[in-house]
Curated annotation (Swiss-Prot):
GO cellular-component term (any): extracellular region
Cofactor (UniProt): Zn(2+)
Gene: btfP
UniProt protein name: Fragilysin
Note on cofactor: Binds 1 zinc ion per subunit.
SMART domains the record matches: ZnMc (SM00235)
Signal peptide: 1-25
Length: 405
């Protein structure tokens, strides 16, 4: 006799339902996993206690179009940074191509990667920190000695807070290899008692409003991204380190991209060459006038007067002047007769000088906001905050600032 066992059937149905649910859940999890693997950036970590050129290059070369999550670790310090490649900015240092990478605004972190060097920069507790690494050991040792030399004279007990050599963790011998250096710029300036520099009288007004910025010269939305060429000429006899000049270039480009959303419409292309010109004295005004005259008389520069030029040196000029430029001298629609030019120091301890002088070239005036890039005294802040300045920069780059940008 066949007797239906309802309890047993209920159990079978329950098992079937559970099995189906498990299968659906598995499919759902697989789909979620697939979506995550496609959309989520890869996560990696960098140990700052032993960071080298190879470490930075390996991680940065692997940054995809989706970006990449990199965790910076240092003895209890952990920062997760979403890193994206800056595809708008091109840098050529002689024969070396350099790529830039930025974190999100809240990350306050940026990277620079060249064929022979790499730089990591970030802010921590309001202080600017840089890690600098070179690929070749000889050059790495030279850079380490260059930055260490001023501290040897101070004998400061807190020197390590400002400057530190990073050694290869795999080397166990007494003579460990230096793979990078760490510099806390804010602490270093205090220990070394570096002078406070200002930007007062750091620009020259042209005889007339250069190439009159008129409504007819602007357009609401550019038809395509405009490439702005910035030609940086190494002053004759001046030593320029690629990690320093590329950082100045990165700050200059980022300062403009942040203005009214210009990063959608502007590309910067920086190149570095050497010039035979050198300033005849320490007078910055005289130096800039001579530099502009040398460009006008150089047959190789003929036909390139629509570009921006910088004379760069490692040092400063008389009266602690960090740079000098022709004010409001560039408009994207007209040639400038080489007056869209300036001078800038490349010193690591004074970030953003090229960005400040570029601001003047694009028409930005000094402000009374100490957190503004265009503040008259050097503070190290890297962003334009004045609406008036940002509007004139946008006009000089060829269009009106759109509402809501």
């Amino acid at each position: 006799m066949f007797i239906l066992n309802f309890n047993k059937m209920k159990n079978v149905k329950l098992l079937l339902m559970l099995g189906t649910a498990a299968l659906l859940a598995a499919c759902s999890n697989e789909a979620d996993s697939l979506t995550t693997s496609i959309d989520a950036p890869v996560t990696a970590s960098i140990d700052l206690q032993s960071v080298s050129y190879t470490d930075l290059a390996t991680q940065l070369n692997d940054v995809s179009d989706f970006g990449k999550m990199i965790i910076l670790k240092d003895n209890g310090f952990n920062r997760q940074v979403h890193v994206s490649m800056d595809k708008r900015t091109k840098i050529q240092l002689d024969n070396e191509n350099v790529r830039l990478f930025n974190g999100r605004d809240k990350d306050s972190t940026s990277f620079i990667l060249g064929d022979e060097f790499a730089v990591l920069r970030f802010y921590r507790n309001g202080e600017s920190i840089s890690y600098i690494a070179y690929k070749e050991a000889q050059m790495m040792n030279e850079i380490a000695e260059f930055y260490a030399a001023p501290f040897k004279k101070t004998r400061a007990i807190n020197e390590k807070e400002a400057f530190e050599c990073i050694y290869d963790s795999r080397t166990r011998s007494a003579g460990k290899d230096i793979v990078s250096v760490k510099i806390n710029i804010d602490k270093a300036k205090k220990i070394l008692n570096l002078p406070e520099c200002d930007y007062i009288n750091d620009y020259i007004k042209t005889p007339q409003v250069p190439h009159g910025i008129t409504e007819s010269q602007t357009r609401a939305v550019p038809s395509e991204p405009k490439t702005v060429y910035v030609i940086c000429l190494r002053e004759n006899g001046s030593t320029i380190y690629p990690n320093e000049v590329s950082a100045q270039m990165q700050d200059a480009a980022n300062s403009v991209y942040a203005v009214h959303g210009l990063k959608r419409y502007v590309n910067f292309h920086f190149v570095l060459y050497t010039t035979e010109y050198s300033c005849p004295s320490g007078d910055a005004k005289e130096g800039l006038e001579g530099f502009t005259a040398s460009l006008k008389s150089n047959p190789k520069a003929e036909g390139y007067d629509d570009q921006i030029y910088f004379l760069i040196r490692w040092g400063t000029w008389d009266n602690k002047i960090l740079g000098m430029s022709w004010f409001n001298s560039y408009n994207v629609n007209t040639a400038s007769d080489f007056e869209a030019s300036g001078m800038s120091t490349t010193q690591l301890m004074y970030p953003g000088v090229m960005a400040h002088e570029l601001g003047h070239i694009l028409g930005a005036e000094h402000t009374d906001n100490s957190k503004d890039l265009m503040y008259a005294t050097f503070t190290g802040y890297l962003s334009h905050l004045s609406e008036k300045n940002m509007d004139i920069i946008a006009k000089n780059l060829g269009w009106e600032a759109a509402d809501g940008d």
